[in-house]
């Protein structure tokens, strides 16, 4: 069969920002290393670079980055750092091999008592339950913690599972502040035509 190589890019950074080198047989679960002449940094909310292994917004500078949105200077300024990097809105980490891995979308991040919680991590944990087909979570207002995690669960056919079961499983596998406070069981998750979970519809 043909060898498939992963890459990462956006419309604003066409065609690609990072890639995995061809010829490597192992699956890295990363988006690889930066393209030539491309600089990628991970930054916190104050614009400072984060340490290796820490999550930060993926910012890009290179020949493939757009000049700006057509006749939309304010929108362009909103996604451009003071030193000229494009802010992708994706949260990533950098591993010891120099490879980047996407963690989540920054807009989907949940802030619980000042701690950053990434929905993908919680969803991946809950998906390991035998009784769960799939799951998705969002942040909801909470008087004590500003935001709390609300988890939507689609059960496996004929599975018997309740909210207490899910919360107990999360407590065994997640840090305390990441454990969902609310559980909702639904028949199916809203998705785009390509199968992407639409968290915005869950918020509505």
Regions found by a protein language model. Name each.
Residues 62, 67-68, 75, 91-178, ...:
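AMP-binding/adenylate-forming catalytic core of the ANL superfamily
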Residues 5-12, 32-34, 138-141, 184:
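Beta-strand->loop->alpha-helix junctions that form or flank phosphate-binding loops
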Residues 43-44, 52, 80, 88, ...:
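Hydrophobic alpha-helical segments, especially N-terminal targeting/anchoring helices
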Residues 1-26, 39, 46:
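Gly/Ser/Thr-rich phosphate-binding loop
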Residues 31, 37-38, 88-89, 133, ...:
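Short loop/turn microsegments at loop-to-beta-strand junctions
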Residues 9, 32, 47, 90, ...:
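Active-site glycine-centered loops adjacent to acidic/histidine catalytic or metal-binding residues
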Residues 33-37, 48-79, 117:
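Conserved ATP/PPi-binding loop(s) of AMP-dependent carboxylate-activating enzymes
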């Amino acid at each position: 069969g043909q060898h498939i190589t992963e890459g990462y890019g956006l419309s604003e950074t066409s065609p690609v920002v990072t890639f995995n080198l061809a010829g490597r047989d192992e699956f890295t679960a990363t988006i690889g290393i930066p393209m030539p002449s491309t600089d990628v940094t991970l930054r916190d909310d104050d614009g400072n670079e984060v340490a290796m292994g820490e999550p930060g917004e993926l910012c890009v500078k290179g020949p493939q980055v757009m000049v700006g949105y057509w006749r939309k200077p304010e929108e362009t300024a909103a996604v451009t750092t003071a030193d000229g990097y494009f802010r992708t809105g994706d949260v990533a980490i950098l591993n010891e091999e120099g490879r980047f891995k996407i963690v989540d979308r920054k807009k989907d991040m949940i802030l619980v008592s000042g701690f950053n919680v990434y929905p993908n991590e919680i969803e991946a944990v809950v998906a390991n339950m035998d009784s769960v087909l799939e799951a998705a979570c969002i942040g909801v207002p909470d008087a004590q913690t500003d935001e709390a995690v609300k988890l939507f669960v689609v059960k496996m056919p004929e599975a018997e599972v309740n909210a207490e079961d899910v919360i107990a499983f999360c407590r065994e596998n997640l840090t305390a502040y990441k454990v969902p406070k609310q559980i909702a069981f639904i028949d199916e998750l809203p998705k785009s035509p390509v199968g992407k979970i639409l968290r915005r519809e869950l918020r509505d």
